[in-house]
Amino acid sequence: MIRTPVCDLLQIKYPIALGGLGGGFTQPAMVAAVSDVGGFGALGCAGMSASQVTAASAAIRKITDKPFALNFLLFMIDEDAFAAALAEKPVGIALAWPRGDQDIK
């Protein structure tokens, strides 16, 4: 079994993380499934409201007690949704900002 410092930091068994894809591509059940098998599940929160972030976090916690992350795209972040994520206190909050020069053309 591969064990890295990231495993200890995130409280996971394997150094495998689910990408927090927004737009509804990651759902609470998928996040919980990855976390349950020892990886680090992440929920894409881009475009979500504060109440949606809170509800999704509750749905994940209803399925699993394992650690997970909430993921935000900074260029379209909703401050209330981000505040709701902070209040949920997930093990991780992931932030991203895309660069146009890295797009596949």
Task: Please provide the spans of the model-predicted regions.
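Active-site entrance/lid segments in N-terminal catalytic domains of soluble metabolic enzymes
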Residues: 1-105
